[in-house]
Curated annotation (Swiss-Prot):
PROSITE patterns reported for this sequence: HSP70_1, HSP70_2, HSP70_3
Keyword check for Magnesium: no
Superkingdom to which the source organism belongs: Bacteria
The species this protein was found in: Salmonella arizonae (strain ATCC BAA-731 / CDC346-86 / RSK2980)
GO molecular function, one term: ATP-dependent protein folding chaperone
Gene designation: hscA
InterPro entries named in the record: ATPase_NBD, Heat_shock_70_CS, HscA_NBD, HSP70_C_sf, HSP70_peptide-bd_sf, Hsp_70_fam, ISC_FeS_clus_asmbl_HscA
Biological process, per Gene Ontology: iron-sulfur cluster assembly
Swiss-Prot/TrEMBL keywords: ATP-binding, Chaperone, Nucleotide-binding
Source lineage: Bacteria, Pseudomonadati, Pseudomonadota, Gammaproteobacteria, Enterobacterales
Protein purpose: Chaperone involved in the maturation of iron-sulfur cluster-containing proteins. Has a low intrinsic ATPase activity which is markedly stimulated by HscB. Involved in the maturation of IscU.
Similarity remark: Belongs to the heat shock protein 70 family.
Protein name, per record: Chaperone protein HscA
Length: 616
């Protein structure tokens, strides 16, 4: 039996009956909606054939407009024309004003400090604005598909936190949409290219949009995408290319006046048109404000070279964070309209040492990946391809010192999924670690279910806390759990596979969840006590080693004070008084501060011996 033999949410009882699903790319600058028809994923256009919907809403007393009509009001009615609302999602008002001090909106704070935007339609929060954009996309899809949507997959940046993800879900619910899943944007792009069923390894997703740049480093393993690292620049995008080119045209045309909004708009429009033309041509003629001239691709490249270099620096940082070399990357996926610029593609190819994937329209690739996922989740695939599992019914984790359970993947997490957590050694010179995989909701290992045990050997003999072991949990679409432990400095690893709920009935799962609720308060107290006892043992172990090595640094009186504090800690650690143990730990820390300082000075002197100041 797999985790839970359940159908996906809302799965059709009649397998032959096709259900309507859509993938939505809810973007900062533009949004799209896509679906799968006749086996092909495609984005859906409006009545005028435009696939992009500007993520802009214009509010009036008697209603609102979304998209191109709203964007046209931006200059005349700035305060009531809300754009880039994605930047505000899940953030407090203080955070927004700190990050984006030049936003042209009037804000008020709600009772819990969340932003409320003053508009002609009243006070609105970012969730409501996002909901209006989602409604417009859903209406486009319903009209195109001649029916109401049964479910949607909405994409979000990989770096979105829980609050931002929940805000996106709330907006969808407000728009009357059933969210099948939130999907990371880089994962959606990889799915669009079919990389989820391709060769396992590292994939880079380079996303250069109008206003932001994001780089994501993913690892594909057993059909699961794990986000290794993300990075980017929230103040760098294709709009910056446009403004640089507009300034260059202004300089060439000899236009000194910057106060004329009409001329400003004309210059920017000319720059955008020239940028687009230079993606295919080497030279473009520009006619603006009575000036005519030519701009070459080489001139444009010179203008934007520094900005492109900034994106590559962010790529380098993300690779470093992921502990991956550029040559290890199997594929580079290009996302965002600005990746059409030839210099961008050229520099990215040089950086990663391979030709980036550009066959799918970079504006549409995320929405297409979301549509493919939505089509699966809504139940339109044949049984042989159907995902029978949607969520993990019980949390998965590890037993740690003191008999505690550290949850790595919480229950109700959608699968497939991969999560990693770092652990360290408890004792000096420890060269092996026992990995005990647990399942359940309780705080103590004795109250959870043991799934598997394995050992990681060959850990470098370092002081306690010196070794870093990354433990990765992966659950694939069939509910198969793989746990891998790797010591980061040597790369040695060990792993095991297990079916997490083999042998558990639905009623047993429900009982385990119920117990976790019934014993919640008792479990928290037990965990706090166990944590303090573990910390006490760690402190005493460390102190014993320090005294063995450097007792000569202490006077007899100082040694006696430390011994007394340690003896008291050892005594109270045998009891059940959490506060007493905590105070005893603090007392040991206080009594040993001078000792620790002397040991540090001695270590520094030893390290400097025989070296000049210049060498240091």
């Amino acid at each position: 039996m797999a985790l839970l033999q359940i159908s996906e949410p809302g799965l059709s009882a009649a397998p032959h009956q096709r259900r309507l699903a859509a993938g939505i790319d809810l973007g900062t600058t533009n949004s799209l909606v896509a679906t799968v028809r006749s086996g092909q994923a495609e984005t859906l256009p409006d009545h005028e054939g435009r696939h992009l919907l500007p993520s802009v809403v214009h509010y009036q007393q008697q209603g609102h407009t979304v998209g191109y009509a709203a964007r046209d009001n931006a200059a005349q009615d700035t305060a009531n024309t809300i754009s880039s609302v994605k930047r505000m999602m899940g953030r407090s008002l203080a955070d927004i004003q700190s990050r984006y001090p030049h936003l042209p909106y009037r804000f008020q704070a709600s009772e819990n400090g969340l932003p409320m935007i003053e508009t002609a339609a009243g006070l609105l929060n970012p969730v409501r604005v996002s909901a209006d954009i989602l409604k417009a996309l859903a209406a486009r899809a319903s009209e195109s598909l001649s029916g109401e949507l049964d479910g949607v997959v909405i994409t979000v940046p990989a770096y979105f936190d829980d609050a931002q993800r929940q805000g996106t879900k709330d907006a969808a619910r407000l728009a009357g949409l059933h969210v099948l899943r939130l999907l990371n944007e880089p994962t959606a792009a990889a799915i669009a290219y079919g990389l989820d069923s391709g060769k396992e390894g590292v994939i880079a997703v380079y996303d250069l949009g109008g206003g932001t740049f994001d780089i994501s480093i993913l690892r594909l393993s057993c059909g699961v995408f794990e986000v290794l690292a993300t990075g980017g620049d929230s103040a760098l995008g294709g709009d910056d290319f446009d403004h640089l080119l507009a300034d260059y045209i202004r300089e060439q045309a000899g236009i000194a006046d910057r106060s004329d909004n009409r001329v400003q708009r004309e210059l920017l429009d000319a720059a955008i048109a020239a940028k687009i033309a230079l993606s295919d041509a080497d030279t473009v003629r520009v006619n603006v404000a009575g000036w005519q001239g030519e701009i070459t691709r080489e001139q444009f490249n010179d203008l934007i070279a520094a900005l492109v270099k900034r994106t590559l620096l962010a790529c380098r940082r993300a690779l470093k964070d992921a502990d991956v070399d550029p040559q290890e990357v199997l594929e580079v996926v290009m996302v965002g309209g600005s990746t059409r610029v030839p210099l961008v593609r050229e520099r990215v190819g040089e950086f990663f040492g391979r030709t980036p994937l550009t066959a799918i329209d970079p504006d549409k690739v995320v929405a297409i990946g979301a549509a493919i996922q939505a089509d699966i989740l809504v139940g339109n695939k044949p049984d042989s391809e159907m995902l029978l599992l949607d969520v993990i019914p019980l949390s998965l984790g590890l037993e740690t010192m003191g008999g505690l359970v550290e949850k790595v993947i919480p229950r109700n997490t959608t699968i497939p999924v991969a999560r990693a957590q770092d652990f360290t050694t408890f004792k000096d010179g420890q060269t092996a670690m026992s990995i005990h995989v647990m399942q359940g909701e309780r705080e103590l290992a004795q109250d959870c279910r043991s799934l598997a045990r394995f050992a990681l050997r060959g850990i470098p003999a370092l002081p306690a806390g010196g070794a870093h072991i990354r433990v990765t949990f992966q659950v694939d679409a069939d509910g198969l759990l793989s746990v891998t432990a790797m010591e980061k400095s040597t790369g040695i690893e060990a792993s095991i596979q297990v079916k997490p709920s083999y042998g558990l009935t639905d009623s047993e799962i429900a009982s385990m969840i119920k117990d976790s609720m019934s014993f919640a308060e008792q479990d928290v107290k037990a965990r706090m006590l166990a944590e303090q006892k573990v910390e006490a043992a760690r402190v005493l172990e460390s102190l014993t080693g320090a005294l063995t090595a450097d007792a000569a640094l202490l006077s007899a009186a100082e040694r006696q004070c430390i011994d007394d504090a340690a003896a008291h800690l050892n005594a109270v650690a045998q009891g059940d008084d959490v506060d007493a143990i905590e105070q005893a730990i603090k007392n040991v820390d206080k009594q040993t501060q001078e000792f620790a300082a002397r040991r540090m000075d001695q270590s520094v002197r030893r390290a400097l011996k025989g070296h000049s100041v210049d060498e240091v």
